[in-house]
Structures are given as structure tokens and as C-alpha cells.
Amino acid sequence: MNRRYVFSLSAGLLASSCMGAIMPVPVARAQQASTAMTGAQATGGTAAPRQILLQQARFWLQQQQYDNARQALQNAQRIAPDAPDVLEVQGEYQTAMGNREAAADTLRHLQEVAPGSVAANSLSDLLHERSISTGDLSHVRSLAASGHSAEAVAGYQKLFNGGRPPHSLAIEYYQTMAGVPADWDQARAGLAGLVAANPQDYRAQLAFAQTLTYNTSTRMEGLARLKDLQGFRTQAPVEAAAAAQSYRQTLSWLPVTAETQPLMQQWLTAHPDDTALKEHMLHPPGGPPDKAGLARQAGFQQLNSGRLSAAEQSFQSALQINSHDADSLGGMGLVSMRQGDAAEARRYFQEAMAADPKTADRWRPALAGMEISGDYAAVRQLIAAHQYTEAKQRLTSLARQPGQFTGATLMLADLQRTTGQIDASEQEYRSVLARDPNNQLALMGLARVDMAQGNTAEARQLLSRVGPQYATEVGEIEVTGLMAAASHTSDSARKVAILREAMTQAPRDPWVRINLANALQQQGDVAEAGRVMQPILANPVTAQDRQAGILYTYGAGNDAATRRLLSGLSPEDYSPAIRSIAEEMQIKEDLASRLSMVPNPVPLIREALAPPDPTGARGVAVADLFRQRGDMIHARMALRIASTRTIDLSPDQRLAYATEYMKISNPVAAARLLAPLGDGSGSGAGNALLPEQQQTLQQLRMGIAVAQSDLLNQRGDQAQAYDHLAPALRADPEATSPKLALARLYNGEGKSSKALDIDLAVLRHNPQDLDARQAAVQAAVNSGRKSLATHLAMDGVQESPMDARAWLGMAVADQADGHGHRTIADLRRAYDLRLQQVEGSRSASGPAATEEDALAPPSSNPFRHHGYGRQTELGAPVTGGSYSMEATSPEAADQMLSSISGQINTLRENLAPSIDGGLGFRSRSGEHGMGRLTEANIPIVGRLPLQAGESSLTFSITPTMIWSGDLNAGSVYDVPRYGTNMATEAYNQYVNSLSQNNSSSSLRTQQIQGGQGEAGFAPDVQFSNSWVRADVGASPIGFPITNVLGGVEFSPRVGPVTFRVSAERRSITNSVLSYGGLRDPNYNSALGRYALNHYGSQLASQWGQEWGGVVTNHFHGQVEATLGNTILYGGGGYAIQTGKNTRSNNEREAGIGANTLVWHNANMLVRIGVSLTYFGYANNQDFYTYGQGGYFSPQSYYSATVPIRYAGQHKRLDWDVTGSVGYQVFHEHSSPFFPTSSLLQSGAQYIADSYMQNATASDYLSEETVDRAYYPGDSIASLTGGFNARVGYRFTHNLRLDLSGRWQKAGNWTESGAMISVHYLIMDQ
């Protein structure tokens, strides 16, 4: 068996087989259901409807619509409850619902009913599969994907406990086993068994046929099976298409013989445009390259790179296989000539010419040119030292010597072409052709120039004049031309198509593969990129294979694979880029080993950056080490130190540091570094850059423009964001990323329809662009076009089922449709796929606008409005993480994984019913029996999710106890200020005076009472979603006064702006009086009855048994704007306060404020702000006599505070602490003792007047109390502030404990509180 073909396909086969394994119900089972239904229809009886119902149940299980699956299963159970197939689906349903114990019971029953049946075996396999660790399975799959087939097979066997594989994993297991030569026969037998057991399992049929094609002895049988599979396009379209691709690939492996030629001709009849197969038939390669050919090819590549020792070794290896190999002999002659050994070079050339006279012309110029080889050797030394100017001067002089014009000019032209002087090189090639129109080297050189410029037709015309002896070189030039054409287009779909054509022509060319892989990554198809690179990563044959593999794995951030490939590459084969990577790997390894021994990495960073860094590799290495650990703080520090060590940075340094700055999301620093380079042409600022440097510069500039635009868009400044993006839109109208950024700007301004037009236009241009598809799905949801969003998402999943982004788009659509469980399933699928990708890279390798209108950039800034526009100074975004010596987990190191995990956790909690219980305490300052308040409550809250977690219904009941303490009955100041105790004390004074004058008086004094405790429970029902909240409830039932409470708030969001409008009726909880009301102790006393009898209905209408229980009817509006990390808000409102037997009041209030993020890392944040507040009441009711409300109600209140918030989390612990300090000024008017009763107020006035006339120093009532019947006003200015803290700890996914405390000083009161609460998710979704 040819291992080369096995490794080239193993990754693709494994990826396709994994798709079935991660489905909740394996695809093979759905196919079995379809087959069973077909057979049932033929047999008739009760089996047919039963099989149809079972097929429906399996379909709904696959769609994760479990209610529908249960209904279909129950209907089937009514027909035949003990039928083996019914029991099998019953077990599958129980497994999908997570009820493994029930599924195990079902399996035992099934084994009793039908022992050894297919149904029993299938259900047993399913239960075994579900017991396998997902993490272990992902690790084994990553081993297989990286080409470590033997290790992967051992891993699978460990998962299977040495037994046979579960049905859903059998195909991928045997496919992986087929990659181990010693196990190929066993793999074939295993797949043959699967096919025999179920001929309609098309995935097994495909895998079996493909495995047969890998071995020359069974290749024709595999071809026949692949051809048969192509006929099942209706039943199995995916497998049929894959079979066609495998069939075509296998044809290219076959020699052209009488047996194989008809097969190839049949294919060409159906596919007349397959030029590669035509070429294969005309010029059959004779099978895979022999070892001598590979060694010879490597020798010439090494020779062209100046690595003479490696080239000599390669040519000698080829000659050991075939000592008469003319090309290898000639290669040795070239090596000897460059080494300065003229005699040895002459001997090798002569032997080469004698070995193959037909190719003797290749070596005659070299033999003739040996006389001046010293000059050419000197030129080559200059080129190797990058002294291009001196080399060109020597070549120009050399061309003037007799007989040297052609050779020197061609060498000069080649040098000019490779250093980017395309026009000059074209002129030199043409000068050679002017003297010698058929000069083969000049024709090929000029063709390379035309290919590089995109002039494909002209290049091919030149190549048509090249003789067949240069067929290999001509093929390389055509491939180079295709690669140049690909580099000249920013259309990712066209670029991929061009590079696929190039790979068809040069399947083993590593540079074609890496360019195609990079193009696929830019298109978003990371999995396919890995499959393209897999052959050279798993089995690198040449040094160039390793070089390309190193560049690919380095770009993917896979340091382990990069080091592995480097270990097999000789330092002589290092290119400048590879040498830079090798140095970076060494720096990282050394620094990482020392980090574990120090508590502070800063000294090590400075030490590592002390040596010179001419290419920027050292600074990038140090910064990238910390970036990979999630430590952005020290990554930024390393880059800052590296980029400021010298004033005059080289272009290489600027490009390297800027690239790393972009990796850590700091486009501002990257732009600052690139500014001195200008446009790279040298016409303006900066020197001229090499072509590769110019390309890197352009890519960085585009990325910076997009990043800065997104940053400003987050801040809500779409106008300035467009100003940053417009140059990128103009520079490359075909580029995708600026267009998608423009769509995000429209989304940010609330113009979702316009954003959708742009996203759809990009998607029509390149349907494989998953980033564009994701954006289109979100824009469609934002525009209210949910059906379109679902259609786009489903297309993405069908086209790219192994890409996490496709499932993220599906999650957006499903959530918009209210399918919460399906949304979680989509997110979990995306998480698993992304995790596999990350672990794999770590361990190994209305009518819409027209497309033109949507894609065209606006002629002017559409986000710049008249009279609006502010210039925002861009600052570096604050990112980073705390230093840790431990390597980060995949989730912590990968932004997509972290985001998906957060979405899953949030949605899981939103979908799960929950119950909360707690115990809270509150204490408010004031006089005993009046303003002082102590409260204890036990809130019990239940929450039911609605609409896929987008909404919820919350029920709560809160037992509440409040008390104010006992009134100080001996206080001459407190007693008259409570209820109607002023009358009581006046009466008692009268009785005492009368008793002194008449000892026989029968009148008795009344008892002073005051201060009450109350208890009750407060019910409430609340509905809420993202933009509306409404509730209805009551103040505690059991208090003297109970009020119906409730409210509604609307909070629609338009772009970065949120509008809040609310209307609510709430209790004022400042005191026992305002919260629950009080009963006047005098109402039923003898004095009270006397007063009511004496004053009759007039007093009865002004005096009741209870007063208080105040509610505020509040109407409020607010606007909030989120501008990046800053939140601005402002609003105002009006309220009316009413209570039982209390004076009505009204309030006006307004406030503005802002807060901004001043620091954050991966786990913590700090925000600081400022808040300005005003409110004022019509009258002052902050007192406790009858008719007063007992709540703080100044006539004007102003405050300015500075709040600071610190929040964070660490593992299971999270916290949120806010503190504020400020200054307040408020003014209170005077207020009558009894504002609702003219009789009581006139009595109070009479008592006050009488006191002023008759009081003595020993009187019970003090002058301070009754000098007038009004409470005095006041004006106060003082500090204000407080804090609010919460600490939570999550014991399990379902259970969380919260502790909170607060203290506040405001107005004329202080308040403190504490609570302990438990949050429990009843069902873990």
C-alpha cells in the first residue's frame, strides 16, 4: 500500500466520519430508519405504520425536538410496545434526554425480548458510546488528524476497552486503522463487515471503497465500488459526491494501461474540461516519484538556495541509486563549480553529457563558462549576502565581456525579477531575445515576468516556444503564474479556485499547498486548510516540505508542531524567515523554562530583549509567549520595550512588531509603528520596501482600518469610524473584511436592512464566506426577517457542517425563532468543533438593493450628520490578563471558545427554572418609635423561563417584619411629634393641674403610647424580557395598610442608545409609617371618644384610626448611550405621593451622569463615573404626627457623587463592589403638625399659644416642642456617600450562594443592610 495516498486523504476521511459521531442521533441510524421504512412498506401489516413512526421519532431526535420525538415514539409503543425496533428507539430517546439508567433498563428488556438482535447490539453500542469521555475522544481524533494513526488506533482501543467499536464510531476507527500499514487488512475486514451488516449504510460503503483504493492490489475493486456509489445521488447525495471526488483522485494514481485507459476515457467523456487527467494520459508519470527523483529534485532546490553541502549530499544519494543519472551528474558539476573545484566540475559535466547526449545542451554552457566562474562565484556570494546593488554592478560589467552578454544578462534579469524590479528584468530578458529569439532561458524568464504581472496569455505564448527538455521548468512557471494570479486578487473564492488548479498541476509542491491553505483560512475554512497541508505536515519528504510546514504551523500558533518540523530541518536549509522562526522558538523555550522560577516576569523580559533585534523576531517571540498564555499586560510591555529600544527601527522590525500588536488587539500602536513607512513605494515618506514587505504593509493597514472602525463603532461614533474605514474600502474594493466592517457600522446605527444588503452581496459573491454568512444571519434577525435568517443559517450548516461558525449562525437563527433547546445544542456543537480545532492545532497539525449598490462605498460619509460629529482621540484598548506561570486552557486562550462558553452558560441559566431564597436585614437611622426602622425579610422567588429564555415569569413572596422601637414616653421632645400625642399630653397636663387644685377630681391621665412593630408578606408577579418589564403585587399583607403595587418599563435599544420609559406604583419604605402605616393610639381611647363626640362629624372626617402607607406613582424617562467603554445617561421624571389620611405630595426629579471603564483584564474590571442628581417635593412630610407621611421629602435636593465600581471573578468566586463619595445640599420648608386636619392643627396652635402664655420651666411640654404648631424648616450641606458589595460563590452549576452588604449616607439619614441568598437552578438544561 502506498502510504503517501493514505496520509493525503486520512484527514479528510476522518473529518467526514466525525460528523456522524457528534450528532445526537448518528446519521447511520437515520439511514437505517429510512431503509427500514422502505422495507416495511413492502411487507404491510402493522410494521409499516410502526416503522414510519419510528422514522419520525428518529428524525425529531436528530433535530433535538424531543416533545415531537416523544409523541411519535408513544404512538409506536401503542402499536407494538415490546417490538425490538420500538425498544431500540425508546432507548435512544432516553439516552438523548440524559436518562441513562432508564436506557440501561430498556437495553436489559430488549436483550430479554430479542437477545443478540441488531437492535440490541445497536442500543448497546449507543450506550457504550455515550459513556466515552468527550475530551478523550477529541484527543484521539486530533492524533488521527495530525497523522499519528498508530497512536490514534491505540487511543480508540483504550476508549473501547479493547472491545469492538460502537457502531457510530466504527467507521472513523477503521479509517484511522487503514492509515497503519500493518493494520490495513484488519481495517478492510472491519469496514467490509459494516457493509455486509447494513448495505444501505452509505458512509460505510464510501469508507470501504476509499480504503480499497489505497492498496494497489485492491484499487480496481475500490474504483468499481466508488462508481456504484455515484448512482445513489438521491438517497445519499453527500456520499455520492465524495465518491465522485475519490474516483477522480484514484484515476490519477493509475498507470495508463489497456485496463485503465477505458476508465479514464469514460471520465473524460463526462468531464471534458479535466485537463489534468488528459495530461496524465498523454504524459503518464509512471507512478509515485522514485527515491532518486526526489533526491535529485531536492538537490537542485538546495543548489538554487545556495546550500551546497545539502545539495551535494542529495545528488550523491541519487547517484547511489543510479550512477548514470545525467541530471544528478550535472548537478554535481554545478556544485563543484560553485565550490571552486574546476577540474571536478569539468569531469562531472562531461560524464553527464556522455550519460544522456539528448540533454547535453544543458551542460555545455556551464562547461564553457567555467573560465569565468570566479566572477560568477563572486556575484553569487554578493547575492547570498544580500548585497544586491554590488551584484548588479558586477553583472553589468560582466555582460560587457566577450561572450558573456547572454549569461550575465540572464543572471542580472533573474536577480532583478526576484528583488522586485520587474520592469528592469523584463527589459533585460528582451535584450537577450533580441539577439537570440529562441533563447530558452530568456523565454522562460520573460514568461515568469508576464505571469507575475498577470499577463497569462503572453506568458503561455512564450512558453509554447520552449522545447520539451524544459517541460518540468515550464510546468513550474505555469504553477508560479497561477500563484501570482491568486496573489493579485482579493476575491477569496477566486483565489481558492486558482490555487486549487495550481495544486492539481503540482500536487506535491509545498508552496502551492501553503498558499492554498492560507487562502482557505482567510475564507474561514480552517478545517479544509488543515486537510490541504496534512500530507506535508504528516510526512515531509523534502526540506521545502518542512519549510512550508514550519511557516504554516507557525502562522497557526502551533509551537509544538513548529518545533517538531524544525528538528528535522538542517540549519543549512534555513531561509531567513525560517531562521527567524527558529530563533523565536528557542527564545520562547528558554524564557518559558525560566518563568516558572520567578514571581515577577519583568526582569526576565528586559533580559530577553537586551540583545540586538534587527528583524524584530526577538521582541515578537517574547510578546507572543505571554499572549499565548493570555497575559496581555506583559505582552504589551514586551512590545513597548522592544519597539522603543532604538529610534530608527528597520522595516522588518516595524512590520513584525505591528503584526504582534494586531494579535493583541492594539491597532493604534500598530498604526503608530507603520506611519514612518509611508505607502512602501519610497515615493513619499519612508524608503522603498521589498514586494513581500509591501504586501504585508497593505494587509496590516487594512486590518488596522477595520479594527479602528470597529472600536469607534462600539463607542457609537459611526461617523468617525467610517472615516477610518473609507481608505480601506477605496484601496481594495473587492476586499471582504472592509465591506463586512461597513455592514457592522450600519448595524451599529440601527440600519439593519442596509447592513443586510451589504452582507448578502458579499455572500452572493462568495457563498463559502462563513464570516459574511454569520453577519448576514445576525443582520436578518435584527431586521425582523427571521425566515431569511434561518434559511441562511441552514445553508451554512449544510455547506460547512464541521465549522464552528456555521453552527454559531444557526444558534442566532434558532434563538430568534424561540427554540432555546436547539440554540444550546447549536452552541455546544460549535464549542465541540472549535475545541477540536484548537486542540488539533496545539497537538499537531424588502426588495434588496442591487449587489453593485450594496458593495459600492458611499460617495460621502453617510454617518456624518449636520451639526453632529466629534473627534474622538483613539486610545489603545485596555486588554490583558494577570500573570500566571501555568499554561492557559484552550477556553482561556481562545476568544471564540470563551465567547461560546459564556453564551452557553447564560442561555442555560435563562432556560432553567430557578428558585431563590434569602434572609435580609435593613436598618435606618432615626428616633425610636418614629423614624428609626429595622426590617427583616425572607424573599422567596421562583422563575419560569418563556420564549427560549428570552422572557421570564417570576413569582415571589416576601415575609417581612418591621419595627421602629418604643417611643420614649418620658421625652418632652419626642412624644408630641408622634400621632396625636400632643393632645394627650395637653390633656394630661390639664388633669395634673386639676388634681393639684381639687384632690377629689375623678379625671385620670391617659397613657402615652407610640412605636409599633408590623409583620406581613408581600406577593409579586413579574414578566420581563430584553425590552419590557412589568409586575403587579402588593405591599406586605398584614401591615395596617396594604397597597396594590406594580409597574411597567419599556427599554428599547437603537444602536448604542437605550431609551427607558417607566410608570410604576411603589411603597415608600423610609419608615414604619410610610411603609406599612400606623394606628393612632388615641383613636379608641377615652380622650379620643370624647373628642369625636364633642366635635362630631367635622372631626370624624378629618381624623381616622390609621394613617400612612404612602405610595409613589412615578413616571420616568431616561436615555442611555454606550460609547465604547463609556456610558452616558440622563433623564427625569415626575411622581405623585399618596397615602391613607396623609397629605398628597408631588416630586420632580432629574439626573445626568457618566461612567467609564478605566481598567480591566480577563477576570476583573474597574469603572469610575460621576453622577449629578436633583429632586424636589412640593411639601415636607418627613414627620410622624397624624397626616404626615414619614418620608424624606425636601423641597430641593442637589448632589454630585463619584461612584467607583470594582468587579471580578476567580474560578467559582465572583464579586461586585461599588463605593461612592460626594457632596449634597438640600432645603426643607416648615410643615404643620397636622397637615390633613384643620381641627387638630388649630388645637395644636391653641396648645402652643396657651403654652407660651402659661408655661413654667417645670412644665412637661418644652418650649422647643410647642412654641408653634409647625415643624421648622432647615438647610443642610454635607458629604454623602456609601458602598454596596456582593460576593457570590458557585458550588455547582445549579447552586450559587450570595452574600451582600451596603451602607449609605444621604439626606438626613443613614441606612445599612445585609443579605444572604441562595440561587438554585431546578433543571440543568
UniProtKB/Swiss-Prot annotation:
Pathway(s) per entry: Glycan metabolism; bacterial cellulose biosynthesis
SMART domains with a match to the protein in the record: TPR
Region (Disordered) location: 838-886
GO biological process, one term: UDP-alpha-D-glucose metabolic process
Coiled-coil regions listed: none
Signal peptide: 1-30
TPR repeats: 50-83, 85-117, 292-325, 326-359, 406-439, 558-591, 702-735, 737-769
Localisation: Cell outer membrane
Record-level GO cellular component terms: cell outer membrane
Membrane topology, from the record: Peripheral membrane protein
InterPro entries: BCSC_C, Cell_synth_C, CellSynth/LPSAsmb/PSIAsmb, TPR-like_helical_dom_sf, TPR_rpt
Main subcellular location of this protein, as a coarse class: membrane
Keywords for the protein's UniProt record, in alphabetical order: Cell outer membrane, Cellulose biosynthesis, Membrane, Repeat, Signal, TPR repeat
Domain of life: Bacteria
Family indicated by similarity: Belongs to the AcsC/BcsC family.
Function statement: Required for maximal bacterial cellulose synthesis. It may be involved in the formation of a membrane complex for extrusion of the cellulose product.
The protein's name in its UniProt record: Cellulose synthase 1 operon protein C
Organism: Komagataeibacter xylinus
Gene: bcsCI
